[in-house]
Amino acid sequence: MLRDVDLTVRAGSVVALLGPNGAGKTTLLRVAAGLLTPTEGRVAIGTDEVTRRRPSQRAREGLCLIPEGRGIFPNLSVRENLLLQVPAWKRGQSVEPALEAFPVLRERLGQTAGSMSGGQQQMLALSRCFLSDPKVVLLDEVSMGLAPRIIDEIFDALLELSRRGVALLLVEQYVSRALHVADHVYLLARGSVTFSGAPTELDESELMRRYLGGDELEASATN
């Protein structure tokens, strides 16, 4: 359950959402994407409120979610996965622009997505997102289980996206990586924001205390 969460992701910024398991990070992404409807509050893309709009409607507004499971179609080819992401009014356009960040996919356009490595599948998920010309990208553990070299490639592509003005909100298991790329950090614990600020405002001891819910543990011990 989320409580009194006020979160802003500005165009071109990279915002990291950190916290222990069960803190509400994935729930927050699902609310933003329209997969869950909040009982209170609002979700907006720019000045356009989208709280009651379906996920497909939010996607047309420029929101793209890359879930932890990557959200690709394993039985379809790479090319078919990409073509499915092309908006109806752009049908017939080339998928080539989506491959610029990950040239390795050019060699695998006819290959089924499920037969590729985990890193290549994540590259495909990102390429699908890039094709939709997103304004906001929500990323849930994009580096999960990937080799360091692949993680570097993926984050290079994401940072290039942010330089083009796309807003990024990421849930990331590697805290040091998240702090390195983020402009702003939110820490969640038990559904509430316990910290909001620049990565440089967090020292390691404070980060670990907040990340592990230290404030709440201390309060419980006092009582």
Report residues per predicted region:
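ABC ATPase NBD coupling module
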Residues: 37, 49-70, 95, 107-110, ...
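ABC ATPase C-loop
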Residues: 129-130
